[in-house]
């Protein structure tokens, strides 16, 4: 029996749907014979198709190859008829068969967002050949051109620009999903330059995607350098303080956990990608200098339940620790300055920073002690002991570590020896030099406090309230007694040497002091003319005590000085100096410190004599005569050198007396007296111009600043505001001048001023010049509105159309309807055993965000993952839902309040022109300005027509939005941005959940099959490794192995050199590998 095959398909080796089998004998053919020939050709063609579709996952290929033959033939026919390459929805680009026509459609000056969205959808589903052709024909460049234009127009921040930027970035992400696209983008420096500039977008999801793409590029061989260069480019273009500044600051500012995770993963990628250690240290140093460790600590506290973010924070710290360990092994190759710099960068901005400063100060102090350079041997021994301890107990709490020094023997009288008066505790041999220093410092501080209290002791700060004065004196005396006792006893404030006798003597002294104080108060009550003044003496050390007679007045002198006391005293000297005498009697003088200052003089002239020198000190130089000015002078806060320290210096034999005589004392006193001297006719003094301000002072000051900004005469400013020439007068200048247009109150205040107009301030002079311009305020407002009208309309109309179109699209979308039906089915099934089951519908805005929160019992999946899987199985074309809802993303960014505000501004401005200028066309008042009046009224007519159209669009928008909210059962008060953003975010999460589900299945299948995925290096593959931290773990393992191999090679070389120098047969040598401790590697040779 013979037969032949005849195919009507375009491919000769493929049996198509219209192929027929004709038998020469008319009998049925042998089934086995036909199947054999079919299978050979069908399998070959189907393998080629799988390669073309870039299906290289072995699990997926196996599933596809197991399809029935009829399904394989259908797929082959669809591919040959170019059905597969045609977009599955109607859009701006009807077919993607011709790659060049697609590229030319986006290579125009004005590209609609819809075209970019359509391209992005196709890039996500196109086969590898199409994407390769797209790249070969330079299809990326038109996308980059769009990003360039958006960056040039960044000053006009429109929502549609941000969305277009976002869609272009998503197109680049779609290209990077496969390896050839990733390699192409990584080797295209212009792409990364434009991508880093997108980090300034207001859309947080766009910033997150950009950082994810940059992170994936940074871990490729050719991409890391491009990303680093682009970050430098970003610093220059955006005028950053330093590189990475904005990036690190975003860790503090942003609150979106997804963004923070991606940002940290990007930082980890650019730090850890270089293979050489110095490069990683240098890059990380820039981040440490920006105090990133402080922000990481805050993120751990604020997001302690976000596993992905915590993983990236762990990666940063683990990479830091690993590189520090490797760096310590190579420490001899690094300069001491670099080591200090690395340590400083490591702790800057952390709580340990102050501890490091204290430690370095301690090192500096100890290196100058008696130990000298031997101190470093001591510290090295301590560090080695601590390192060994951490090896044995890695979880050791370092705050509980104590160093074991030889125990100090204590005498029976206590450590500080309170029973001995001849020895100071600071000189006790039982104390270390450090303890002596600290004790001496403490005593000095207490002595300063005592001296300060002694100076304040005689100050009468209680006014006429003598009881309050007594309380203050008691408290000060008590504190002085305690401090002097502590200083005498060693400053410990306790200890074994403090007995009860000392406390008893202090109590008795205080009782005696109180009795004397009461006697002094009674004396003051009986003689109320006593005045204790708190002013200082000439030398500023001892308070002056002024006493007046009963018949004298207490009013101050005209110069502001205290009244000159009389010689008729009403109080004895013994009662005046009770406090000072009592303190000197109740406590013993301290060796090496001066006694309390002497009492103040009983007369008003001169100051007290200088205090006596300290015991054992040199005598002072003779006191210089005090030259008292005729008026009270201002203070000159210079720092004088004590007389004891002048000897042997430049000042020792210097006599300035002759210079004082040559000074112009009159001029010196007139310039630096405490109060300005009265103006005299004969004095040479510059006359100052009197400036009169009649308007609000704050407004006048701001107006003066504004005039300095323009730096042109008032008449020229007036002319500019009359002409209002758009070529020479900008909108910004008009806004500036509008703030200082003279109001009705300003004009009245200036007109009421009857003085010399030349004495008016700069602000009044300006307003005097321009206030005769009719309706100046309205003119400037009309000019500003005319300048910004076009931008207002360009921003307003697309927003109105987006809400209207998105409302209609949601109502017509069949795919969205199918999704909501499946959600209703799943919800009723899950809640079937509860009162929430059997629902007829659900609140969309409240339910959709909860889909991801409903977790499976193993906490790995959510209802959103299950929904995505179900939709893929039942309605695989559901993922083209974006084609049905092209305006929902734009609508999600629109604020209804902004639409109302902008439209109201247009309405107010049109009414203002119509009210103030349209009736003035024939007004003689505006005869000199007829040209501008004509221009502004003509503009008003055009603007009014456009506004009427906008009003109509707003009415239609409101009607469409009310219908869609009612259609889904949502309240009418719902805001459009809330409504559309909820649905848009849900659809994006749904698509993302499907990708996560596929990745989990793929990972499980690969683990079970023990097969390696041949297609690595795509965006999803790299992002998954980055997020899980596996990419960094693999690198650390590699670095550790390399380091061990290098150490072993070094040991072998040392061993070889040793063996060659020894003439005898070398003994057997056992090599021990270096320790894995992160603190102290201990590679050794054992014989």
From Swiss-Prot:
Major place of residence: cytoplasm
Self-association state and partner proteins as the record states: Interacts with vasP, proB/profilin-2 and rac1A. Interacts (via GBD/FH3 domain) with activated Rho-GTPases.
Role description: Formins play an important role in the nucleation of actin and the formation of linear actin filaments. Important for cell migration and formation, elongation and maintenance of filopodia. Specifically controls filopodial dynamics by regulating actin turnover at the barbed ends of actin filaments.
Location relative to the cell: Cytoplasm, Cell cortex; Cytoplasm, Cytoskeleton
PANTHER family xrefs: FORMIN HOMOLOGY 2 FAMILY MEMBER (PTHR45725), FORMIN-H (PTHR45725:SF5)
Organism: Dictyostelium discoideum
Residue intervals of the GBD/FH3 domain: 34-394
Pfam entry (one): FH2
Region ranges (Disordered): 1-25, 416-445, 549-625, 1048-1087
GO annotation, cellular component aspect: actin cytoskeleton; cell cortex; cell trailing edge; filopodium; filopodium tip
Protein's name according to its UniProt entry: Formin-H
Composition bias type Polar residues, residue spans: 1-23, 569-588
Domain of life: Eukaryota
Occurrences of domain DAD (ranges): 1013-1051
Segments of skewed composition (Pro residues): 592-616
SUPFAM superfamilies in the record: ARM repeat, Formin homology 2 domain (FH2 domain)
């Amino acid at each position: 029996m013979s037969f032949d095959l005849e195919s009507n398909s375009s491919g000769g080796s493929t049996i198509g749907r219209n192929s027929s089998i004709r038998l020469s004998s008319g009998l049925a053919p042998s089934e086995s014979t036909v199947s054999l020939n079919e299978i050979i050709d069908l399998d070959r063609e189907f393998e080629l198709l799988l390669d073309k579709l870039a299906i290289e996952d072995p699990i997926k290929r196996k599933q596809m190859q197991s399809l029935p033959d009829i399904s394989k033939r259908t797929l082959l026919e669809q591919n040959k008829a170019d059905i597969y390459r045609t977009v599955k929805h109607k859009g701006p680009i009807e077919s993607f068969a011709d790659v060049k026509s697609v590229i030319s459609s986006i290579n125009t000056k004005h590209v609609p967002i819809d075209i970019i969205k359509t391209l992005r959808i196709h890039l996500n589903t196109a086969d590898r050949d199409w994407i390769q052709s797209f790249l070969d024909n330079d299809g990326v460049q038109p996308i980059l051109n769009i990003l360039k234009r958006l960056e040039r127009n960044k000053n006009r921040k429109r929502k549609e620009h941000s969305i277009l930027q976002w869609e272009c970035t998503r197109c680049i992400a779609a290209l990077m999903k496969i390896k050839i696209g990733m390699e192409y983008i990584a080797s295209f420096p212009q792409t990364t330059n434009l991508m880093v500039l997108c980090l300034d977008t207001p859309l947080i999801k766009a910033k997150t995607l950009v950082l994810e793409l940059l992170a994936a590029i940074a871990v490729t061989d050719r991409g890391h350098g491009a990303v680093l260069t682009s970050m430098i480019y970003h610093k220059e273009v955006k005028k950053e303080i330093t590189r990475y500044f904005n990036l690190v600051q975003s860790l503090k500012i942003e609150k979106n956990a997804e963004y923070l995770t991606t940002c940290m993963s990007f930082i980890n990628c650019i730090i850890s990608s270089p293979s050489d250690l110095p490069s990683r240290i240098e890059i990380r140093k820039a981040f440490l200098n920006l105090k990133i460790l402080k922000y990481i600590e805050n993120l751990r506290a604020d997001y302690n339940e976000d596993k992905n973010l915590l993983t990236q924070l762990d990666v940063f710290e683990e990479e830091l620790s690993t590189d520090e360990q490797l760096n310590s092994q190579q420490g001899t190759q690094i300069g001491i300055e670099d080591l200090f710099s690395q340590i400083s960068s490591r702790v800057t901005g952390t709580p340990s920073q102050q501890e490091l400063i204290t430690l370095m100060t301690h090192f500096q102090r100890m290196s100058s002690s008696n130990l000298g350079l031997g101190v470093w041997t001591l510290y090295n021994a301590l560090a080695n002991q601590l390192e060994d301890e951490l090896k044995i107990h890695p979880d050791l709490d370092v705050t509980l570590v104590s160093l074991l020094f030889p125990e100090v023997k204590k005498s029976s009288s206590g450590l500080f020896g309170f029973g001995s008066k001849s020895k100071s505790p600071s000189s006790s041999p039982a104390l270390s030099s450090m303890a002596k220093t600290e004790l001496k410092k403490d005593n000095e501080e207490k002595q300063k406090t005592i001296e300060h209290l002694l100076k304040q002791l005689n100050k009468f700060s209680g006014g006429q309230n003598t009881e309050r004065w007594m309380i203050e004196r008691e408290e000060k005396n008590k504190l002085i007694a305690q401090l002097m006792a502590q200083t005498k006893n060693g400053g410990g404030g306790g200890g074994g040497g403090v007995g009860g006798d000392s406390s008893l003597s202090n109590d008795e002294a205080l009782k005696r002091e109180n009795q004397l104080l009461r006697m002094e108060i009674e004396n003051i009550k009986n003689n109320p003319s006593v005045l204790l003044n708190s002013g200082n003496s000439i030398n500023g050390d001892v308070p002056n005590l002024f006493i007046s007679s009963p018949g004298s007045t207490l009013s101050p002198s005209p110069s502001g000085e205290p009244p000159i006391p009389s010689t008729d005293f009403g109080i004895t000297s013994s009662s005046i100096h009770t406090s000072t005498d009592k303190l000197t009697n109740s406590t013993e003088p301290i060796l090496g410190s001066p006694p309390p200052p002497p009492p103040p003089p009983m007369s008003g002239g001169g100051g007290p004599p200088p205090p006596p020198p300290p015991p054992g000190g040199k005598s002072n130089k003779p006191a210089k005569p005090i030259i008292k000015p005729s008026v009270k002078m201002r203070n000159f806060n210079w720092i004088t050198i004590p007389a004891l320290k002048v000897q042997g210096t430049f000042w020792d034999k210097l006599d300035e007396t002759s210079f004082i005589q040559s000074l112009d004392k009159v001029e010196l006193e007139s310039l630096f007296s405490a109060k300005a001297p009265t103006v005299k006719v004969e004095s040479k003094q510059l006359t100052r111009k009197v400036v009169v301000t009649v308007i609000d002072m704050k407004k006048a000051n701001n107006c003066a600043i504004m005039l300095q900004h323009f730096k042109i005469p008032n008449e020229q400013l007036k002319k500019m505001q009359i002409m209002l020439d758009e070529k020479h007068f900008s909108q910004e200048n008009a806004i500036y001048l509008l703030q200082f247009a003279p109001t009705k109150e300003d004009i009245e205040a200036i007109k009421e001023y009857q003085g010399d107009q030349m004495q008016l301030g700069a602000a009044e002079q300006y307003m005097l010049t321009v206030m005769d311009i009719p309706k100046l305020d309205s003119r400037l407002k009309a000019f500003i509105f005319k300048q910004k009208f076009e931008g207002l309309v360009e921003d307003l109309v697309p927003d109105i159309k987006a809400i209207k179109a998105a409302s209609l699209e949601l109502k017509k979308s069949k795919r969205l309807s199918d999704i909501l039906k499946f959600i209703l089915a799943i919800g009723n099934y899950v809640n079937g055993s509860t009162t929430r089951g059997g629902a007829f519908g659900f609140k969309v805005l409240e339910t959709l965000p909860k889909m991801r929160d409903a977790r499976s019992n193993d906490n790995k999946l959510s209802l959103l993952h299950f929904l995505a899987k179900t939709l893929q199985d039942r309605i695989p074309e559901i993922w083209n839902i974006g084609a049905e809802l092209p305006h929902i993303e734009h609508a999600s960014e629109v604020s209804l309040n902004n639409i109302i505000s902008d439209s109201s501004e247009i309405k107010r401005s049109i009414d203002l022109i119509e009210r103030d200028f349209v009736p003035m066309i024939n007004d003689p008042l505006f005869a000199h300005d007829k040209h501008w009046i004509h221009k502004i009224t003509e503009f008003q007519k055009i603007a009014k027509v456009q506004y009427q159209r906008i009003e109509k669009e707003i009415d239609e928008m409101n009607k469409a939005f009310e219908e869609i909210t009612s259609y889904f059962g949502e309240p009418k008060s719902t805001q459009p941005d809330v409504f559309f953003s909820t649905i848009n975010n849900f659809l994006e999460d749904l698509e993302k959940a499907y990708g996560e589900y596929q990745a989990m299945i793929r990972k499980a299948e690969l683990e079970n099959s023990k097969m390696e995925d041949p297609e690595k290096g795509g965006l999803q593959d790299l992002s998954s490794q980055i997020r899980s931290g596996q990419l960094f773990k693999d690198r650390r393992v590699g670095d550790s192995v390399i380091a061990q191999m290098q150490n072993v090679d070094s040991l072998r070389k040392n061993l070889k050199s040793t063996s060659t120098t020894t003439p005898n047969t070398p003994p057997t040598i056992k090599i021990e590998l270096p320790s894995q401790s992160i603190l102290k590697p201990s590679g050794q040779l054992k014989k």
